[in-house]
């Protein structure tokens, strides 16, 4: 591989004074660092393959090549710092097997015509979302990026078996698990409004929660202008399915306090909740 700029190219840049020598050296070092990271990732993957062969667990060549392709996709969408923190990006056969089994369970329920509001569908969707939260390290920005990667990379479906239909089924079943709880707190009119509008802006939540996490990490004051803007965005999104009546909102708050399930698969941590309550 070419290690950045050639000496002739460097001389040409200096002669034309396009870049200073320190700038050229910085560019060279950045290029070499990127190449070293690429080589290091390939080395790690080859070590995993060698260990599998040494233990007598000869991997299927096609599966291994698919894994390499999947890792290349992660490299395109995540920085090195993000990859180091993202469990999904790690070479972990146990995790991969757990996701294959979850995916097969969903396929079985779908093939049998199991409705999304059935107990088994809601339980499976909850397990899926809890695992997803765990394997994104509880960071909603990773979830947002994974969703974008899944939509933009056709190979993702081939590599993981997670089709748009599966995602839609899980999303609906998980929502039904929340709606079933709220039905115990809301009257018929309130529940009808929530059910009608719950899915309207569902896809906006991960990006907003990611912004809340970022605000907490960066120490943004809840009462600052940017903190207040985030709080207003959260309230607007919440009221899009909860409505604006104070008595109804109080019922939602009571449910959130008394029903731990409502916090599952939300990527909302105690720290983020505390920050939001102060805003």
Please provide the spans of the model-predicted regions.
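Amphipathic alpha-helical "stalk" segments
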Residues: 2-279
């Amino acid at each position: 591989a070419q290690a950045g700029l050639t000496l002739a190219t460097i001389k040409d840049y200096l002669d034309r004074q396009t870049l200073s020598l320190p700038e050229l050296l910085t560019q060279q070092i950045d290029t070499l660092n990127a190449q070293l990271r690429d080589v290091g990732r390939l080395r790690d993957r080859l070590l995993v393959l060698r260990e599998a062969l040494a233990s007598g667990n000869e991997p299927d060549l096609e599966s291994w090549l698919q894994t390499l392709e999947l890792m290349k996709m992660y490299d395109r969408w995540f920085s090195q710092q993000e990859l180091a923190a993202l469990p999904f990006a790690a070479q972990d056969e146990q995790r991969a097997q757990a996701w294959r089994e979850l995916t097969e369970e969903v396929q079985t329920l779908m093939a049998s015509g199991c409705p999304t509001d059935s107990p088994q569908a809601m339980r499976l969707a909850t397990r899926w979302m809890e695992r997803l939260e765990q394997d994104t390290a509880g960071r909603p920005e990773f979830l947002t990026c994974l969703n974008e990667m899944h939509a933009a990379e056709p190979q993702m479906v081939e590599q993981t078996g997670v089709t748009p239909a599966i995602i839609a089924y899980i999303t609906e079943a998980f929502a039904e698990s929340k709606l079933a709880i709220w039905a115990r707190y809301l009257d018929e009119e309130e529940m009808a409004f929530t059910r009608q509008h719950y899915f309207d802006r569902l896809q906006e939540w991960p990006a907003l929660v990611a912004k809340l996490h970022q605000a907490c990490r960066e120490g943004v004051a809840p009462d600052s202008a940017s903190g207040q803007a985030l709080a207003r965005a959260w309230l607007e999104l919440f009221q899009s399915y909860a409505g604006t009546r104070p008595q109804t909102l109080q019922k939602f708050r009571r449910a959130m306090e008394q029903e731990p399930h409502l916090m599952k698969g939300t990527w909302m941590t105690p720290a983020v909740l505390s920050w939001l309550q102060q805003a």
